[in-house]
Structures are given as structure tokens and as C-alpha cells.
A protein has these predicted regions:
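Solvent-exposed residues in well-ordered beta-strands and their adjoining turns
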Residues: 8, 23, 652-654, 703-705
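Short secondary-structure junctions
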Residues: 512-515, 670-680, 723-728
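Short amphipathic alpha-helix segments
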Residues: 624-625, 660-682
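Inter-lobe coupling/hinge segments of SF2-like helicase ATPases
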Residues: 198-204, 208, 212, 222-660, ...
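A carboxyl-terminal module marker
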Residues: 672-693, 718, 731, 735
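Solvent-exposed, membrane-proximal periplasmic/extracellular interface segments of envelope transport
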Residues: 55-58, 62-72, 565, 682, ...
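Short amphipathic beta-strand starts and helix->beta connectors
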Residues: 4, 627-637, 674-688
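Accessory, non-ATPase domains that flank or precede helicase/AAA+ motor cores in DNA-metabolism machines
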Residues: 1-363, 375-391, 673, 709-741
């Protein structure tokens, strides 16, 4: 028998099958989905490969498969092949997403094991020897007395409780009294979580209506997609919990996806308090490779029926899915920005169609495309218009910063926001200040000649970080010393422009010195568990003001927060992206939703230089429907998704001549192949950020509704490019990417 394998390498020219003989002794082990080791080319080391087909004979002279490692299912291999075509990547890259973490030879993880101690002789026999005085050592006697009551203890435990040494234990082993047995232990990311159990809540009429409609499809094993559209605080999570309970009753598995930034202790604790941690597995990037390895095993063995995770948890190794829930479905993190550039929402839909179960997409600010599908009845809309605990939506006020400047206020806090913070402090209530930009100042400029400090590797301004007293590039991580004189004109008129979270923290501490503050952004949560520690401090340690980027918006419930201030609502408007209005509306609505979530009324103050922008105005009114009507009309007029697909083909490299010639080849190839009546194919041009990490960046854009032939044309083009032996240029395609930059 012959196995058709894909070599586990990212090179585009290896995105094809190679034939290998299946030796007689491996015939029962090799199936479609097997990971195998094979000799490849002239290399002396074996390569990992994936079996994607089996046939009787080959027309080539073939080598033998050397070893079988582990298996994926035929269903997973079919999904990987579909993904490779859809997302313009190698099959092997897709298979990796579904493979067990920690099984690569370079980074192989093994089961974690410890030695535990058991009595080798019968207890009665040991009792006789202790009483007869045969065992004279007091420490040996203490160790045996302890083990009579505590068999399975570790060496450290025996030593700690009996004050004996390893040498004493070795003597007992040598004399046949005890034995050391190796025991596997799980690396459990939830091991320190002790949560009080909670009971399910009584659903409101709106919640019950939504629950019943989704539960009907669970009971009937039927595929259907639902948009659970509910205002912030409307109780979507309680519906998720009660749906998962119904899936558990059927003995099936639930997958709950949340944005990585929302995978907070608070989110996970709600599930543990309802279902316990034994039945729960968590998958996200902050886990160690060993923890991911053990959580994956727990799922594979059927010991976890509830899986909570970020985007990649959609590939959890389970065949008995009863529901997939995608919370905050509008979040951009559900689309991968590195190869394979897949959409977790699209994968969920494919899995559900083939597995006959429902998908629930939850959001207070749905993705425009999702809401459009609901309006066209392609998915079922379920609406929650009221907050679950009868708390009112917060009052939202817009402050025009142009007017503040005209009145002489140059502070980062408008008069209204300053007064509300002071009032909150007197009332012993908490405040959140939001700015979607970290650092101290966003750029440094010489006022004499206009020089701007830019990264030496990227064509982008450096950001000043006050606490480290350094300039940092947020694209490549490059750091340099702070400038005191201009390198161009030698002037000392260096000024810091823009505002980041560090600067807000410093300014607030100056303006309101009696307030206690804490900051949460990428710089302060880089260590494991630091995210949790900051939130716990804010919640429990009488901290008055939390300052942060969008990570403070997601997955948190602070009962004592009654004021939210948005420092600069324009940040997300000033980007080169057709979704700028949508993202601005979403983030402002989500931020506003943090205020007044209990009985206390909430206030939100949005500071902006563009008070008349419709996305800011309608975020103040929290009117998604009107926002959608305006935005969808603009998209229809300008032909943007959902009225077409956008494909960006990116070129990056160090040799400008080769890069431009490669981009021209791709343009001419696709221009000649694709139907110009159906597709707008734009010529390659430098990207808006035309250099990152010392690599030149170009892009070309294709707009149109993708068909099977269009996917085929682009995939063939990419294969042809890599067969041309380009040395200094990388080319890739992305459909409906997160960023147009």
C-alpha cells in the first residue's frame, strides 16, 4: 500500500503530495490523518509528514515510511484540504492547527510524572516488625507510620511531615518495605481556582424566548445559526450557560469561543462556578506548552465536555460537538492575521453544517456582515433589548474637544470629565478611563525643522515610553534612546506629541492627586497572571481609577464602576480602513457598557474632535439599527463587504527590484485569468506602511464575489510564483483581512 503525504514545511512548492510505501509492520497503524516520519530529499534527518490519502500503487520509485506518531481523523484532513484552498495556504499549515500541542520533535512535551511511595509489605507484617523492634531507626519508624495512613504520598511530603531524608527512604526501599511508583499528573491551569458554586438564574421573557429557540435545535440535532443580539448587560452569558447545561444532558461537548483579550479569570470563573472545573478545559495562548498538551489530552480522552478558548479552540479534538458559541462575535481576533489566515466563524459554520448542531453568535454590536445576513434571513436573529437585572443603560455625553481648547482647557481631561471623576471620588465609586493607544506620547518631532523620530527598521513613528525612558516601535519592538537634540538640525526644540495610556496615568495623578490609579495595557500585562492581578486589585483594593486600552473593555463586570471616560474617540477613526466607522461605534458602545451594570446609574463621557461623526453620535445614542442603516448604505455604494469579498495580495522582501517584478507578474497573471466584469483588480502599489522590520511592503487589491474558479486562479498564481525560485520576496493572499494596512 502507498501513502500520499504532505511534508510538514511551509514552503509553497511543497504544497503537494509525495508517495511513500507503507511497510507491512505499519499497515495497521497508517490511516488517513496519520502523522508519520519519512526520509525526504538528501536530508539525513527524518521529516514529519501527514498522510492525506492511501492508494494501491505508485508510478514512482518510493521510500518507506519510517515511523507513525499519532493520528488525526479523516474529517479533520478534509477540513484541512478545504481550508488550504479557501485561505490560500499549505495543507500542512492547516493540519498543524488540529495537531496536539507539544508533539513536534524540536519542542516535544512529555507527560509530567512524579514518584509516589507505596508500602511493599502488608500493613500487618509492618505492624509486627515495628512492635518487635526489628526496625530500630526512629526516622524509619516515623516514615512507615506516616505511609500506613498516607500511601501515594510524594518523597517531599514524607520528608516534610516526618523529618526524614531521602537516604532514609532509599534504605526502606532497599529493605523491601516501600516502593517508588511513577505517576502521571496533569498540568492544570485551573488548579488554584476554588470557586463557590452558583445556581442558574431565572431567565427574563426575552432571554427565555431566545433560549427556547436555540435549545429546540440542540434537542433536534439540527444545524442553524443564530445571532444573539443583546444590549450590554442583557444576560447573554446566562443563556450560554443554560444552553451548555442542555448539551451536557445529551452527553455532548460545547465549545465556547471568546476573544483572547476577554479570556479573563472573571469569564472562566462563571463557568467553573456553574459546572465545576473537572469537566472544563481551557485553551489559549497564555498557557504553557505543557498545560496546552494536557488540556488537549483531556479533551481528546472525553474528560472535558466544556471547552472555553480563543480562536484556535475551534480545532479542539472532539467529535461529539453539541453547540458552538462565539461571544463578542464582532471581535477582529476571530480572524487570524498569520497563515493560515482563517476565520473561526467560518470554521464553526462548516463544522456545524456537517455535524448537525447550532452555532450562536453573540454581540451587543454585531459585525455588519453578520447583521446583514440576519436581515436577509440567512441566520436567525434573536434580540435582547433590556438589561437582565433591570439596570438602565448609562447616560452618554459627548464633549467637543475643539470647544474645550477654545475655552482655554488644554488638559487631557475635559471640564465635564474632571468634575464627574471628582464627584465619583466623593461618592466612593470607581472610574474607567479608556484610550486605545499605549505608551506616553505617540510621536516625537523637532519643532525647528519638522524631523520625526522613526523606527530604523519600519517606516513608522516611534512611541515614547516614559517609565522606561525609551522610544519603542510597536511593529518590530525596536528600542532607542530618547532624543534631546534633533539629529537633522541639532536643535533642542524636541517635543512629544499625542497621548498614550502612560501619559494619561501621569496627568491624572497630577490633576487628581488624591485618587489611586492603576494602568492596564500590553506593557503592564506581559507577565503570566498580571492581567488577573490588576483586575483583582481594581476590584478589591479600593483603587479609584482604572486606565487602559481595549483590554479593559472585554469580559469584565465591575459593580462599583459608575463612570467611564473615553479620552479620544477619534483614535480608531483615523485609520486607512473601510471598517473605521464600524470599529469606532463598536468600541465606544462596548466601553460605555462597562458603566452602571448593577443598580447604580452609569455615566459615560466621550471626548472627541469629531462630535458630528455618525458613528460617535450614534454610539452616544446606543442606536445600532440606525448606525447599521447608514453604514450598510455606504458599503453598498462603495462596494465593500458584505457586497463583495476583498482579497489583499501582499508582497514583502528586501530586494525591491525582485519584489516589484514579482508583483507585476501576479497582477498580469490574475488580470488575464479573472473575469473583469466580475472583479476589480487593482495594480500593485506600496502598502500604507511601506516598510516593517527592514522589509519593503507592497500590496494589490481584488474586489468581487469569490467563486470556485477565482479561488483556483489565485491558488494557481501563488503556486506559479513560488516555482519561479524567488529568493528575497514573500507573497501571500488574505480574504477579507482584518487590516487594510
Amino acid at each position: 500500500m502507498i501513502a500520499e503525504v504532505i511534508i510538514d514545511r511551509a514552503a509553497k512548492k511543497l504544497n503537494r503530495t509525495f508517495d511513500y510505501n507503507i511497510p507491512k509492520d505499519l499497515e495497521d497503524l497508517v490511516i488517513i490523518g496519520s502523522t508519520v516520519l519519512v526520509p525526504f530529499g538528501n536530508s539525513k534527518t527524518l521529516e514529519e509528514a501527514y498522510v492525506i490519502g492511501i492508494k494501491e500503487t505508485s508510478s514512482f520509485e518510493v521510500k518507506d515510511i519510517a515511523k507513525v506518531k499519532h493520528n488525526l481523523s479523516d474529517k479533520q484532513i478534509r477540513l484541512a484540504k478545504w481550508m488550504a484552498k479557501k485561505y490560500f495556504c499549505n495543507v500542512s499549515e492547516c493540519i498543524k492547527l488540529m495537531s496536539q500541542p507539544g508533539t513536534k520533535r524540536k519542542h516535544e512535551v512529555k507527560d509530567k510524572k512524579i514518584n509516589v511511595i507505596y508500602l511493599k509489605k502488608e500493613i500487618e507484617e509492618i505492624e509486627i516488625e515495628l512492635q518487635s523492634g526489628k526496625i530500630k531507626s526512629e526516622k524509619q519508624r516515623r516514615a512507615l507510620e506516616f505511609l500506613k495512613e498516607n500511601e501515594g504520598a510524594t518523597s517531599n511530603e514524607v520528608e516534610m511531615f516526618t523529618d526524614c531524608s531521602k537516604a532514609i527512604l532509599k534504605t526502606l526501599e532497599k529493605n523491601g518495605y516501600i516502593e517508588f511508583i511513577e505517576k502521571k499528573i496533569e498540568r492544570d491551569p485551573l488548579q488554584n481556582k476554588e470557586i463557590t458554586k452558583t445556581e442558574k438564574l431565572k431567565l427574563t421573557e426575552e432571554q427565555e424566548n431566545a433560549f427556547n429557540k436555540i435549545n429546540k435545535t440542540i434537542q433536534e440535532n439540527k444545524y442553524e445559526e443564530f445571532l444573539l443580539y443583546g444590549v450590554t448587560g442583557s444576560g447573554k452569558t446566562e443563556i450560554y450557560l443554560q444552553l451548555i447545561e442542555k448539551v451536557l444532558e445529551k452527553g455532548k461537548t460545547s465549545i465556547m469561543l471568546v476573544p483572547e483579550i476577554s479570556l479573563t479569570p472573571q469569564t472562566i470563573n462563571r463557568f467553573i462556578s456553574r459546572f465545576g472545573k473537572e469537566n472544563l478545559a481551557v485553551l489559549h495562548s497564555k498557557l504553557s506548552i505543557g498545560e496546552r498538551y494536557d488540556e488537549w489530552n483531556k479533551i481528546k480522552q472525553g474528560n472535558a465536555k466544556i471547552i472555553i478558548g480563543a480562536r484556535s479552540a475551534i480545532f479542539a479534538p472532539t467529535d461529539d460537538i453539541g453547540i458552538i458559541i462565539i461571544d463578542e462575535e464582532h471581535d477582529s481576533s476571530y480572524k487570524s492575521e498569520s497563515s493560515p489566515r482563517y476565520s473561526a466563524k467560518e470554521i464553526a459554520s462548516i463544522l456545524a453544517k456537517h455535524g448537525d448542531f447550532p452555532v450562536v453568535l453573540g454581540s451587543a454590536t454585531p459585525d455588519i456582515t453578520t447583521y446583514y445576513k440576519a436581515q436577509k434571513n440567512e441566520i436567525t436573529m434573536l434580540e435582547l433589548t433590556k438589561r437582565a437585572n433591570n439596570s438602565t443603560l448609562p447616560q452618554v455625553q459627548i464633549v467637543d474637544l475643539k470647544q474645550e481648547l477654545a475655552e482655554g482647557n488644554r488638559s487631557i481631561l475635559s471640564t465635564a470629565l474632571y468634575e464627574e471623576i471628582e464627584k465619583n471620588l466623593k461618592d466612593k465609586k470607581q472610574t474607567i478611563l479608556f484610550l486605545n493607544r499605549r505608551g506616553f506620547s505617540t510621536f516625537i518631532m523637532c519643532r525647528e525643522c519638522g524631523y520625526t523620530a522613526k523606527c530604523k527598521n519600519c517606516n513608522i513613528s516611534m512611541t515614547y515610553h516614559r517609565f522606561e525612558n525609551k522610544l519603542k516601535c510597536h511593529y518590530c519592538g525596536c528600542e532607542q534612546k530618547v532624543l534631546t537634540t534633533c539629529p537633522e538640525c541639532k536643535s533642542n526644540k524636541i517635543r512629544y506629541f499625542g497621548t498614550g495610556t502612560q501619559k494619561i496615568e501621569e496627568e491624572v495623578n497630577k490633576i487628581i492627586p488624591n485618587a489611586t490609579t492603576i494602568r492596564m495595557d500590553v506593557d503592564t500585562v506581559s507577565k503570566k497572571n498580571s492581567h488577573e492581578e490588576i483586575l483583582e486589585k481594581f476590584k478589591n483594593e479600593n483603587i479609584d481609577i482604572l486606565i487602559g486600552t481595549q483590554m479593559i473593555v472585554k469580559g469584565h463586570h465591575f459593580p462599583n464602576v459608575t463612570l467611564v471616560g473615553v479620552i479620544a474617540a477619534d483614535t480608531s477613526l483615523n485609520i486607512d480602513d473601510y471598517r473605521a466607522n464600524e470599529r469606532t461605534f463598536q468600541i465606544l458602545t462596548q466601553v460605555a457598557g462597562r458603566a452602571g451594570r448593577e443598580k447604580l446609574p452609569g455615566n459615560v463621557i466621550i471626548q472627541t474632535y469629531n462630535p458630528d461623526n455618525f458613528s460617535i453620535d450614534l454610539a452616544q445614542k446606543q442606536d445600532y439599527n440606525e448606525f447599521f442603516d447608514i453604514e450598510i448604505a455606504l458599503r453598498r455604494q462603495l462596494k465593500y463587504p458584505p457586497f463583495c469579498d476583498i482579497i489583499i495580495i501582499s508582497f514583502t522582501g528586501t530586494n525591491e527590484k525582485e519584489l516589484i517584478s514579482t508583483s507585476e507578474y501576479v497582477y498580469k497573471y490574475l488580470d488575464s485569468k479573472m473575469d473583469k466584469q466580475k472583479y476589480n483588480i487593482f495594480r500593485p502599489v506600496p502598502s500604507p506602511i511601506d516598510k516593517i522590520q527592514n522589509k519593503i511592503r507592497w500590496r494589490m487589491i481584488i474586489k468581487g464575489n469569490m467563486t470556485v474558479k477565482a479561488y483556483q486562479d489565485i491558488n494557481e498564481c501563488l503556486t506559479n510564483v513560488y516555482s519561479k525560485n524567488i529568493k528575497h520576496t514573500k507573497v501571500w493572499a488574505d480574504i477579507n483581512p482584518n487590516s487594510m494596512i
